[in-house]
Structures are given as structure tokens and as C-alpha cells.
Amino acid sequence: MADKKAMNHNNKSVMKNKSVMKNKSEAKNKSEVKNKSEVKNKSEVKNKSEVKNKSAVKNKGEVKNKGEVKNKGVVKNKITGKKKDRETVKPMGEKITASKERQKKYAIEKTVKLATEKRTAPKTEKKKQNDMCQYAKKCGGCDYQGLSYEKQLREKQEYVRKNVGGFCRVLPIIGMENPYHYRNKVHAVFDIAKGGTVISGVYKAGTHDVVNIDSCRIEDETADAIIRDIRGLLRSFKIKTYDEDTGYGLLRHVLVRRGFHSGEVMVVLVLGSPILPSKNNFVKALRKLHPEITTVVLNVNDKKTSMVLGEKEAVIYGKGYIEDTLCGCTFRISPKSFYQVNPVQTEILYTKAIEYAGLTGKERIVDAYCGIGTIGLIAASKAKEVISVELNRDAVKDAVTNAKRNDIKNAQFYNADAGQFMVEMAEYRDDQKKNPTPASGKSGKRATPDGNVDVVFMDPPRAGSDEAFLSSVVRLAPKRVVYISCNPETLARDLKYLTKHGYEARECQPVDLFPWTKHVESVVLMQYCGK
């Protein structure tokens, strides 16, 4: 910024072909020194400026000389003492080289050459976009608006290093080649603005005021277009938006999910009541605008709550879910299913996690907080047995379906709290027979009768894991624990517990799943070293 201000100030200066600057100074010992400097700037000025300075010299060789060249850049040299080179100011886009100074007893001759050279940024560093998102100050969703992507990665790298670096080596963060429109899940809240205009977008940070958004740089473009057209259809079909204050109205939210590889699109209409007038005609009109839509689901949320989705659902078009592929497996994604929003970076993250597990085909693994079974099913072909546990019943049903869809027969799924499940496994190994309920809802034979586990994958929510889970991991003592985290702070807290109880953190790999936000994913390998 200092360079820019100097450049702006100097551009306002009047420069003639030959400019003479005369400075008078008082000299002791009646010594006068005349110093002439020629400056050539190839980018702006091809003239020679003569600078005559009369400097005061005290005693032997102490010279104070201030020379100022007014050009596109500003160079100030302060020299004190003998044969001492000083660094010069380096404007953006210019490279400055200075010849060696020759100092005589009462005179200094210095030649400074300004050579304009375009400073080329490395291929890995792209220039920051000049235009910020038009919703940046209202939406609040993207924490890093105004920062170049390279700067964002450096910030996240430091964030992970600060929290995890004390436990193990932190590898350089893996960023995206194209950090735009990566979100395969888009949610919009609907409202009426002053004047009766239908708007949709997100809540303004800290409020329930809706910020109207037509398009978002991190959201799937197809999803944004569908949401915009739904706004228009509401007017045509005279469907009112839901009013949170009064409880009147129908449409509350719209959720759009799109398969990155499959291209399948699911639209979820969240209503305040179970009846959508002219629903068939509405779907027909919507699909006429967007034939890529493969399914439409009505979700009923008739409670005054901040939750987006309600309990009841009805499929009004298509199969009620979409499918997509990840790391070679096909996954079923329902309206409520947890599925990472950035499939490109998720493949990188999960591939690294399975690499850390060091599977040989003989291991019994636990996939805790499994969601729809992604990590465990991807790892199944490299393991002897997979035991997956998830609290969300709908997600577990999808996981069971996904195992069948991929013809995976060595995986079993349990609908249970991960912490309690691990406690029971540890107790069972200690000959206390407490069996969890399988996902089918029927009591069945224990998946691990001896309670032995070789590898644990854990991917908890932002709050991290809990002591019940972690203490059970310590009791079961698997050889390796692969911890996937979306919060470096809670990750550090849990690593502290595990490292105090026989585990050593070996390596951490940060992966940027959420460009333009402060959030970052990390995967850590932990090895059991004994108590």
C-alpha cells in the first residue's frame, strides 16, 4: 500500500525532460560535496534526472545523504558510515538492482538502476479476483471474501498446524484446482420482501432476515437456477411462502442435491403443511424448465423450529433419492442423508484415510459415525470385515442399501450412538454380554464376538468425539486409528486424550473441502504404541 500511495503521489508531480533538484546544506569544516545521480526507469520515464545535493560532512567519513527520485516509484537511500549498501524500496511489479557504492573521503557516488520487470506469480498462485461477491457483506457465509485462494490455503494450513502441529507432522494442505461452484447440496429459505416480491436465499448472519441471492459462487449452478425458477412458479401457482412469525403460508425451504458424477438432481420442497395445490402441474412446469430433475420430494415441517427438514416425507416424482459414485462405489443419497458437499475433495480425503489405515485384507475395521456408509464401504474390498455404526436411522437404511448396491457382503451396520456402541464392544470383550440392536431392528448375533478390532475410522461432527468413545477405543486398543475431523480445535482435544493413553499421532493431512470459508478437513493417522 505504501508503494501505491507513493506512486499516486508521484504521478501527480510535474516532470520535465530534465529535472534539477537543489538542496542546500550547511557544511562543517567548509567541505561541500556534489553528488550527481542518474536514474532510468524503462517502464514510464526515459529521461535523465540530475540530482545535486550538498551534504554536510562531519569529521571523517560520516555522511548523511538523502536522495529522492520522483518517478513512478519512490526510492529513498539513507547512508551512514563507510561502504555500506542499503536495501531500496521495491514497488510491486518492479525489480530494483543497486550497483556497489564507492565512497571516497568526502564524496559518495551511487548509481541506482530501476529496471521495470513484470513480476510473474508462480503457476500455483493466481491473482485475487478484483470483484468480490455482491452478497459478501450481507450473507456472511464465506469468511474469506477478499482473500486470494492461495492466501486462504495458507491461513488454513496455519490453523491446522497451530492446533495439531504439537502432536505430529502436518503435511501441506491440498487445495482445489477450481474452488468455485463445488457444493452439491444447496439450501434456500423463502420469504416475501416489501412490495410482495418472492425472495429466496440465506439468513443474514445472526438474524432470520432473508438475504435474496440469485447465484452463489460456491453453490452448484444448476441448483441455483432451479431455485430461481421456483420463485417464479410460486407466483404462477399462487403458492404463498411460510411466515415464521404468524405460522401462515406453505413453502418454507427448498433443498436441491445433485450427483457430481451421475448428474441426477433431487428437489425437496419443505412445506408447512402436507398439501401442495396442483402438485402434479407444479412438477410438470418445473421439469419443463429443468428436465435434468430426476426426483421431487415433499418434506413436511409444521413445527416452529430452526430445523430445516421435518419428519414426514412424500415422493411426488421419481424414486425419492439420487445416486452418485465416490471412489469407485455407488451411493444412494436421500433428502436427510449426510453426504460430503464437495465430492472432488472428498475423494482425496477418503483415499488418504484408507491409505493411512494400511489395510492388507486381514483387518476387522470399525467405521464410526458412518453416515450412509461411505468410508467403510470404500474400504471393504481391502478389509476382512467392516462394522459400521450411525445414530441416524435413515442414513443407516441408505448404508444397508448401498452395501447391496455395490455387492459388498463383508459389512454390517448398526443403528446406535457411536460412543455407547464402542463401550458395549469393550465390555463384551471383557465378558460382559451386552448386544446392540442391528439396523434391521431385530436382535442378531454379535458382529464381533471377541470384540477385537484392528482399525478404527472415526469421522465425528464438529463437536468432536466424547470420552465414552475415546476411552473405549483405548480399551479395545486397535493398531491404528484414522481420525477425520472438520474442526482442528476439537481434533486437538481428542488427540491429547489418545496420546495420553497409548497412541502416537504420526501424520496429519489437511484437505480444503470448503473454499472461501474458514472450515477445513483433516485426517490424522494414530498408531498404538502400548500403555
Task: Write out the residue ranges for each language-model feature.
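Short, acidic/hydrophobic/Gly-rich beta-strand patch recurrent on exposed beta strands
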Residues: 201-204, 268-270, 399
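Short, aliphatic-rich beta-strand segments
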Residues: 256, 263-272, 330-334, 455
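Extended interfacial segments that mediate partner engagement and assembly in macromolecular machines
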Residues: 140-241, 261, 276
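Intrinsically disordered, Lys/Arg-rich low-complexity segments
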Residues: 2-124
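Short, solvent-exposed loop/turn elements at beta->coil junctions and helix N-caps
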Residues: 172-179, 244-245, 253, 257, ...
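Flexible, glycine-/basic-rich loop-and-beta segments that form/coincide
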Residues: 127-133, 209, 529-531
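Rossmann-like S-adenosyl-L-methionine
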Residues: 3-8, 278-280, 284-288, 292-531
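Immediate flanking context of iron-sulfur cluster ligation sites
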Residues: 122-138, 169-178
